[in-house]
Amino acid sequence: MKALLIDDEPLIRDIFTQFLELLGHEVDVAADGREGLARFDPLVHQVVLTDFLMPGLTGLAVAETIRARGHTTPIVMISGSATLRDERRAMQAGVRVLRKPIPFAQFAAALAEVVEHAGTGQ
């Protein structure tokens, strides 16, 4: 599986890239929401993982833009700062929200669940 990881913090990008590679996934990275949208290819990326709070476009804006373009690619928003209102908006866009810090096992389980549900149309 190939993932697109969008986060403005280099250390966080490195950590989640390592998580994804440990799980056997290939990873493309983007340093902000605009770059993430430019790099996103629904024919290449089976999942998008995005931070919530980034300069320019938030992760929520990225997710809403992807959905507005008609794409159903699974999206996981990883946040330490999203409000409950933000989380509700994300869930309405079909986005799975994970709160930082997140243990590796919980991240792996959530990622597997999101991808499995996308594959079954649920």
Where are these regions (language model features)?
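Receiver (REC) domain active-site loop signature in two-component systems and cognate sites
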Residues: M54
